[in-house]
Amino acid sequence: MTALNVGVAMSGGVDSTVAALLLSEQGWRVHGFFMRLPLPGRDAQLQRVREVAGRLAVPLTVIDLEQPFTDRVIRSFVDSYRAGLTPNPCMHCNEQIKFGLLAEAMRAADMDRVATGHYARLVRAGGRASLARAAHRAKDQSYFLARLRPEQLDDVLFPLGEWSKEAVHRRAETLGLHFRGEESQDVCFLANGLSAFLASHGLDRTAGPLVTADGSTIGQHTGCWQFTVGQRRGLGLPDATPWYVTAIDGAANRVVVGKAADLMRQECNVHAVHWTDAPPSLPWRGLVQLRSRHTPAAAEVIADPAGTVRIVFAAPQRAITPGQFTVFYEHDRVVGSAVISRPTPATAGDRP
């Protein structure tokens, strides 16, 4: 059988390196593709990618995506914080950049398949691919891929879906490649920290009130964009028990604070609902993950007569955060996702 071409998104890190290595060993004609993005240390990163590609004897193509990344990912990120939301830029990047523009460039270069070093699996049935969790949950990245449409996944390969991170490191070391201690950061463009980044993009330190749920002002802050729901540090509110951020009003530059129990909510409204297949009839019941490090919890997705979509959990959840993505799972399979609009006001029944 004639070998097929596969384009591998290469970053110079251990995951994409081993993904390319495994595909080459399986008989694919591997071509590396590097996204040039407006990131700190990008020249050093490109040099590392070239070294790795040379070591693997795979050709490398550099795709300049600096402007689209700025327009679609960074601008959205900054605007979200300005509005008092907590965004997840990796979700936008995967949907629009990595599996959008980069994948399109690969296909235009006659690649038969698109591959990345993500820890996730694909289940193929009826000619379509659906996303599922990686075999090893500790590094599962299906949450970050949940906005991808079926047509974006049909020609995709995830070579590391069955691998543990430790096994990937060991495989790289058999080639004399050592990556331990080089774990990538959560948000690739925040090398100098969130506050410095947002300040450099025009978010100023405008003073505003710290208020309790009843509207009482108990302190001041220097910019609501410095906070996220559930945050404790930086409030400057000494007390016998800690205060936490429970809500952010970006328009009024106001941060609402409360005690630990005030972070517990049992439901929230969502928007931008995306189902990977045909939308199911509601209510839908399954597991819902509120953020990347949240343990999925039993919940149902319902719609009221006005069309507002709401998630109701079987038990209260901590720090439901507007702007974050929720991902819907049936067992290990991703079936949908949505963006959190705002937490429903707490009632006595919301608290444990």
What are these regions (language model features)?
Residues A115-L122, G127-P352:
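AMP-forming adenylation/ATP pyrophosphatase catalytic core
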Residues M1-R147, L157, E166, E173, ...:
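ATP-dependent adenylation/nucleotidyltransferase module used to activate substrates
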